[in-house]
């Protein structure tokens, strides 16, 4: 239901007019929101930042993968690939930081 509402709000279309790529992009956002909402605040800005950024970056990766599946524009496809590469690297860096500080994701 929430995905359908977001679709209506953001593009003014209903049900059958929503294509597969749009549905997958919205699903990536929904997954991110659930993951971010499950992060308990610690009161430590660095920790909270990293724990929230990891699902945010993962959503960017998931959306970029959707772009590679459905997108046609070469410039947007290159951008999607760069996003995947950069965001994966940054997730690894953040996970390493959490590990070095003996914190969990």
PLM feature spans:
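His/Met- and acidic-residue-enriched segments that coordinate or traffic transition-metal cofactors
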Residues: 2-5, 11-105
